[in-house]
Amino acid sequence: MASSTSNSAAARMQTHLQTEPQNRSQNQLQGSVTITQSQTHTSAPVLRLRGESTGESESSTNGERGLGRGRRIQWAEDVVDNEGLGRKKSKVCCIYHAPRPIDESSDESSSDSDDSSSDDDGGAKPSGGNGDKHDHGDECAHGHAHGKGKGKGKERKRSPNAYERQPNYKGKDKGKGGG
């Protein structure tokens, strides 16, 4: 009923504006007073994110019952405890190689005694010599220190990594006090 009353009031105002034009500036002022109201109020759509359906949440009437029950994180069978600390992680700090018998041959040799051609395997090593101090076992040969001492007696000079290296500006005298 209220919407029909406001619609008829708007119609009367428009009729009043059309039948009684006074001067041009007041007519424009009164012409801008026309109000249109709509009574439809729509709520914003709500997006509900749900994991895989387990049957109990599908059978619920409002879709929210049963969402929190029975859900827990489960590690996949191939996720390993890569640091030997009893914690499984999906983010690994090195590539895990399953232990294999000593007499089993492989295409890749991971022992340092077989690699006599180079002192360095190309991997990045932290400065200071003590490294990350985490234990991977005897089979771990992936290029970062484990805090077990100096290792080989002859080490090559450490080169700076990308964050420590100073950029080389060619053609610009940035470091000189010229002008």
Swiss-Prot record:
Q: What is this protein called?
A: Type 1 phosphatases regulator ypi1
**Where in the sequence does UniProt note compositional bias of the Polar residues kind?**
1-43
Family statement drawn from the similarity comment of this UniProt entry: Belongs to the YPI1 family.
Against InterPro entries, the record matches this protein to:
PPI_Ypi1
Compositionally biased residues, Basic and acidic residues: 131-142, 170-179
**Gene name on record?**
ypi1
General function of this protein: Regulator of type 1 phosphatases which maintains protein phosphatase activity under strict control.
Where it sits in the cell: the answer is: Nucleus
Could you give a GO molecular-function term held by this entry?
Answer: protein phosphatase 1 binding
Q: Which UniProt keywords apply?
A: Nucleus
In this chain, composition skew of type Acidic residues spans 104-121
The residue ranges flagged as biased composition, category Basic residues, are 143-159
Q: Region Disordered: start and end of each range? A: 1-179
Q: Which organism is it from?
A: Sclerotinia sclerotiorum (strain ATCC 18683 / 1980 / Ss-1) (White mold)
GO CC, one annotated term: nucleus
Enumerate composition-biased segments (Low complexity).
52-64
Q: Which residues cross the membrane?
A: none
Any single Pfam family the record assigns to this protein: PPI_Ypi1
